[in-house]
């Protein structure tokens, strides 16, 4: 094994987003819609935490889904799922205006420190087409929009460019492959919040391969969840004007 099994690095720029107290609104868990698949280990961790604290430490962030009586979970998928798994009817929420310019939407960009061939081989085995492309970190701004739209990811490395087919649905397959091979210790998995940071590490050689994808719009997200669909974990990265301060809502209020 070339790296520590399950090692994941998160790389985000430093920010100064403030914490703000907002009186939470209790919303029925069945009125809430998640937009990303859940990670079972994280869900189990939060179930145990909520049970031991006998409270939900902080509200989740939600926004109305236009044309429905439901709310999109912007941040807090696993807390919502944990409360639901524990059998409670309501969860503390902070409702935001999703389309406010203060709420920004970006995407997580996966990268690996290690060999990419096992990822490409397994993605191909699971039905995705791998094709050659001619981009490098210095020509990234010139990538064809149509190619990004049709690809699940474009993989860049030193002297390598591969487009993986599948679009949004293909991203679920690739993300699953990345997680599975990472757990086997084949490589270290790195998630970047900003493309510029990822490219810097790729050019320096610290990062071996970078997976880039189309950046979603807020309209994309809303339309996708209205179809009853969910993205792969760590697809969307929402930047909010504030973090909700902890309120420790007792479970007794959620029955």
Curated annotation (Swiss-Prot):
This protein's cofactor list reads:
Mg(2+)
Q: Name the CDD domains for this protein.
A: ParB_Srx_like_nuclease
By its UniProt entry, which InterPro entries does this protein fall under?
Answer: Chromosome_partition/occlusion, ParB/Sulfiredoxin_dom, ParB/Sulfiredoxin_sf, SerK/SbnI_C, SerK_C
Reaction(s) catalyzed by this protein?
A: L-serine + ATP = O-phospho-L-serine + ADP + H(+)
Residues engaged in binding Mg(2+): 75
Enzyme Commission number: 2.7.1.225
Which terms are listed as keywords in the entry?
A: ATP-binding, Kinase, Magnesium, Metal-binding, Nucleotide-binding, Transferase
Its Gene Ontology cellular component terms are: chromosome
Q: Does the keyword S-adenosyl-L-methionine apply?
A: no
GO BP term, pick one:
chromosome segregation
The entry's active site is 36
Q: Which residues bind O-phospho-L-serine?
A: 74, 76-78, 108, 234, 236, 238
Class of this enzyme: transferase
Provide a Gene Ontology MF annotation, just one: kinase activity
Q: Which Pfam families match?
A: ParBc, SerK_C
Q: In which family does this protein belong, per the annotation?
A: Belongs to the SerK family.
What is its biological role? Free serine kinase that uses ATP to phosphorylate L-serine to yield O-phospho-L-serine and ADP.
Q: What is this protein called?
A: ATP-dependent L-serine kinase
